[in-house]
Amino acid sequence: MSALKTHIAKVAAGTALSFEEAREAFDIIMSGDATPGQIGGFLMALRVRGETVSEISGAVATMRAKMLRVEAPAGAIDIVGTGGDNSHSVNISTGSAFVIAAAGVPVAKHGNRGLSSLTGAADVLIALGVKIDIPPDAIGRCIHEAGVGFMFAPAHHPAMKHVGPTRVELGTRTIFNLLGPLSNPAGVVRQMVGVFLPEWILPVAETLKALGTEHAWVVHGDGYDEITTTGETQVAELIGGEIRSFTLTPEEVGLKRHTKDELRGGDAAYNANALRDMLDGAAGAYRDTVLMNAGAGLVIAGKATTLGDGIALAAQAIDSGRALQVLDRLVEISNG
């Protein structure tokens, strides 16, 4: 039970772990060979000193090696946030996933229950009637036939059972908030990742680059781990091995600026009703924010060349009724 101590001492001394050292440290943790005290000490030492790209990349490599995989069509994307933004908003990336799928791009959605919000992706999907505790082959069928499938993180990362209790006891953000969105069980190489603080935009983009991602947007908007309509969104786009940074506002793509109160969510039933209404064509802040996020997803997937084009395709996907049909089909197939 002492194998992790060397790594704890190194991090506590302010030294960064190499990719291989981080991979080894997280293998020890996720194999059940560290005590809760050691895990907690290691995670907080990383957090206080600040996690590096090599450490995040090494940890993700271990996560990916141990996860239960799902087969998804070529070109599938993920749209996911780290959580930890304490925004208590409606479910933006989950709503966007249905719109992206309705526009013809398969979505392998990875997510969890609410950690920093009242209602995470898993919570709202259950409230909508989606069955989430289904085997990998059934999830693959959902992606192929409905256009979207949901991979419940704890089911696909069973090694996380060794860190779950410690994370709950710590009650604060750790490196694991970053690892989940980077460890998609379908192995997508195109994705949008929202992060809880703007200082994590570039490190996460650099990590995705190191791990071979083809095209990604890493975003943070006005306190949200999403693209927002409440203010400015900071973006790092990774494409072709190069990273460029830019900002977005709703006005520059022809959308209205909204308030945070307009995006505030509630419990799972409240958020489920709001999501279904949005997919059914309800206008307002939720729709506009989903249009921006889904539009970006369509750019990442190569379905649209500009964000404006992506937003137009996303609007068509909602207004045609196709987005709501995707949700209904997912409910049907997941329960089949």
From Swiss-Prot:
NCBIfam families: trpD. Homodimer. Belongs to the anthranilate phosphoribosyltransferase family. This is Anthranilate phosphoribosyltransferase. Keywords: Amino-acid biosynthesis, Aromatic amino acid biosynthesis, Glycosyltransferase, Magnesium, Metal-binding, Transferase, Tryptophan biosynthesis. InterPro entries: Anthranilate_Pribosyl_Tfrase (IPR005940), Glycosyl_Trfase_fam3 (IPR000312), Glycosyl_Trfase_fam3_N_dom (IPR017459), Glycosyl_Trfase_fam3_N_dom_sf (IPR036320), Nuc_phospho_transferase (IPR035902). Pathway: Amino-acid biosynthesis; L-tryptophan biosynthesis; L-tryptophan from chorismate: step 2/5. GO terms for cellular component: cytosol. Anthranilate 2 binds at R167. One of its GO terms (molecular function) is anthranilate phosphoribosyltransferase activity. Mg(2+) 2 binds at D225, E226. It is an enzyme of class 2 (transferase).
